Amino acid sequence: KSPAMPVPGPMGPMGPRSGPQGFPGEAGAAGAMGPRGPAGPPGKNGEDGESGKPGRGGERGPPGPQGARGFPGTPGLPGMKGHRGFSGLDGAKGDSGPAGPKGESGAPGENGTPGAMGPRGLPGERGRTGAAGAAGARGNDGAAGAAGPPGPTGPAGPPGFPGGPGAKGDAGAQGGRGPEGPAGARGEPGNPGPAGAAGPSGNPGTDGAAGPKGTPGAAGVAGAPGFPGPRGPSGPQGAAGAPGPKGNTGEVGAPGAKGEAGAKGEAGAPGVQGPPGPSGEEGKRGARGEPGAAGARGAPGERGGPGGRGFPGSDGPAGPKGATGERGAPGAVGPKGSTGESGRGMTGSPGSPGPDGKTGPAGPSGQDGRPGPPGPVGARGQPGVMGFPGPKGAAGEGGKPGERGVMGPTGAAGAPGKDGDVGAPGPSGPAGPAGERGEQGPAGAPGFQGLPGPQGALGETGKPGEQGVPGEAGATGPAGARGDRGAPGALGPAGARGSPGSAGNDGAKGDAGAPGAPGAQGPPGLQGMPGERGAAGLPGLRGDRGDQGAKGADGAPGKDGPRGLTGPLGLPGPAGATGDKGEPGPAGPVGPGGARGAPGERGESGPPGPAGFAGPPGADGQPGAKGEAGDNGAKGDAGPPGAAGPTGAPGPQGPVGNTGPKGARGAAGPPGATGFPGAAGRVGPPGPSGNPGPPGPAGGTGKEGPKGNRGETGPAGRPGELGAAGPPGPAGEKGSPGSEGATGSAGLPGPQGLAGQRGLVGLPGQRGERGFSGLPGPAGEPGKPGPSGPGGERGPPGPMGPPGLAGAPGEPGREGSPGSEGSAGRDGAAGPKGDRGESGPSGAPGAPGPPGAPGPVGPAGKNGDRGETGPAGPAGSAGPAGPRGPAGAPGLRGDKGESGEAGERGHRGFTGMQGPPGPSGSSGEQGPAGAAGPAGPRGPAGSAGSPGKDGMSGLPGPTGPPGPRGRSGEMGPAGPPGPPGPPGAPGAPGGGFDLGFLSQPQEKAPDPYRDRDLEVDSTLKSLSQQLEQLRSPDGTRFTYSVLEDGCTSHTGTWGKVGAPDQEFGLEVGPVCFL
């Protein structure tokens, strides 16, 4: 025997995806310090610093605005007597005196002119609600509304009875060419054609698209072993390995390079205020300072002395008429004085008033004298005693602004104001200059795993290996994907005609052919028995939205529906944007209602209210009277296609068809034999890192690094908050007076001063110039009552009073036509800002971000000496951001730090995106009906809204009362034959049925029944139009009723008609369906 050739066995199963965890690699060198992080948020404001020394007084500011009017000063001494003034205007009418004795009737006066229309009175208190008015007469019917938009498609109605087959329609017009049909079944191979002459060689064509992969040919003879294939593609990435064992202790690392300066620490808390220092020596006299800024507005000065008397002002415009004051109580009746003579001399200076005399007893009433003629106007009497202050008149128009007063002296410095709120953080200062390099920072935490690196360049092709030993046939591989279609080859010479091949396997089932012509109509089946009424079917699927129907004719206006119920509360609106801080809140809630007012007068009927919401549908009405016969309806749509008729006889053989298109590529043949294995693939990319192994023991301490370079000066910290005021230091010695400072800039106008105190008594004024006419004097004594004049003419009608209360609602008007859907309202104003919600629970930690691409290793810096901290430099202007430095080599893994303290609460997050609307809230309880407001005018009809979405099918309504009996229909065509029913069980003999057994296919039945076929057919024909197909309830048996006289019924027991293999017919007489 020849020695056995070692043949490679079949490919073994794939090894586990994940190998064991590798040993930890050596620690990498420490990475370079990362770039400086972004600036943190502004720190808290520092505490307030100590108060600065007071600045020098500014220049005197411009005079402040005129202060509020001071209290009246004490009256000055009487001035010298002025010139005699012009006669004053007549005094206002005095209060009515007590009724005097009745005078003689005077001569009637002339009719007065009608008075001007009085001002509109204030509205009276609201009266009690009057009794409901009588119902108004029913309004006229409204005009028919415009047709509403078509309603949504109604739910599908119950299936109608099957219609009879329609009449055959006319031949349709020739249709356009249909779309390309699906590829036909693969045609049989045609006979080979004769060989064509070889054509001239064409230009090389462009590469065609790759053709579909052909069916595999029969397995060829095994070829010689091929050369080793090219190197295979990288294998799939291996699964993550298990964690490796704990690594050995690493060697002591070399001293790391000095790190960059660390980020600046946060500003320290302000230190405790130190004790006050001792008083310093008296300083030298300082140089003259710059003028200080304008001081704070001073407090108002004391009230100045009264100024000299000004010139009398011109008369101001008359104020508006004041409201009528309450009527004063009548004074006591004084004794009647004697009539003085009319004086003509100058008015003497007033004497000092004498003491009040006691009131004398009332004298007896004298007889009525006749009224004398009116005497001349007497001299102006002494001013009367000041009366009680009248009620406050309406506010007069503002007087002209006074002239600007002289600036008051600067007031004393006010008390310091309250501490202001913490200001908003100021803008970030410019970045300081870069600091010197700081000490090396600690090693950073290990970075995230980097992304896989890019694929390396392909290596050079290896030399061909020696020919390998042929392997055993491998297992059948899966069918390859279909290749692209190749370019067509050149036409070869025709081969010799081959011998006929063996019959092929049956081809795949072809697509369904076009529907055949309808078969001839079969004989009508026999009428079945009526089945029980089936249960209601499930609601059908929602149909596609129908096309918009044509606009219907205007319907007659419907009757008024009752007012609908208040709708449920709407869904909550979207959250409004956060509003600005609101103004102070509105006035408090309205106080409790007052006592009920007197009833007002009945108001006029209000305008008709807007149309109410549509009421719920009314209950089913009584059945209407039988309508007249309608016109014949239009020809109905074609009914559903009838059941397929029996297959017709085959037609004559048709002519040979054209050769079909080339058949589709056949199904893939059996897989070919396995090829030789290809050369080993390239090494796949490394699998993902395994879980980190447990930390190794700590390495030995590295050598101390050389002293770092002096770090750069950190940026100046923010100013601390104002410290608490220190205790006052001891008083310093008084300094020598400074030289007079330069005049400061004009201060801001001071605030309006407070009202001054009451001034001192003024000196006697100089003699004034002659005054203008005096104001009307106080009221004179009441005159005697004059005779009553004749009644004046009726004045013009007063202005229209305020509208009365709304009358009782009238009967509801007829329901107007429905308005079209209004456009959507504008978004409501944002609601008030809600209380701040409690902090939500901490969110779950986010998934780690994708690893960044590893950067190239940066060069290690030289070790510098450690510098001392320099003084804070001035803030430089912000430099441009430098490019991001290269990432350093990874540092050693640090020990796990302890848990840090909870960080400060973060800033409030930005407002999130608007969430989806919440679920509908539960309907609130129905609130009490509000008081009916006055009806507004009827708005114009809105434009028609777009039709709403199709509504869900409503629940089936209650069964209506039976309608009137319809006309008997015409005889319909015969229906298709029904399937033969299953045999029933034998039954008891029934009454009233005339059962004939029609044995059409057999010759056993007696002839007389055959003559009645037509009779039965016509009876069944007339019934088939009016009955649904009758089916037995469970397919095996049915209950039948025997009808006797008229429509009384007798229900028999379960029974069957006919034997299992018999056909039977029924002669149905008058039928009552129960």
Curated annotation (Swiss-Prot):
Ranges of Pro residues composition bias in the record: 1-13, 149-162, 685-697, 847-857, 974-986
Show the GO MF annotations: extracellular matrix structural constituent
- Residue ranges annotated as compositionally biased, kind Gly residues, are 163-181, 301-313, 588-597
InterPro entries noted in UniProt: Collagen, Collagen_superfamily, Fib_collagen_C
Entry superkingdom = Eukaryota
Q: Which GO terms describe its cellular component?
A: collagen trimer; extracellular matrix; extracellular space
Where would you find this protein in the cell? Answer: Secreted, Extracellular space, Extracellular matrix
Compositional bias (Low complexity): 14-36, 129-147, 182-225, 234-272, 290-299, 377-392, 469-530, 563-578, 611-647, 661-683, 715-742, 803-823, 871-890, 920-956
Region Disordered: list its residue ranges.
1-1010
Q: Where is the Fibrillar collagen NC1 domain?
A: 1014-1074
Its main subcellular localisation, reduced to a broad class, is: secreted
Keyword Secreted on this protein?
yes
Keyword annotations for this protein?
Answer: Collagen, Disulfide bond, Extracellular matrix, Secreted
Query: Residue spans with biased composition (Basic and acidic residues)?
Result: 45-59, 893-907
Would the keyword Disulfide bond turn up in this protein's UniProt record?
yes
Protein family (similarity comment):
Belongs to the fibrillar collagen family.
The name of this protein is Collagen, type I, alpha 1a
Species this protein is from = Epinephelus marginatus
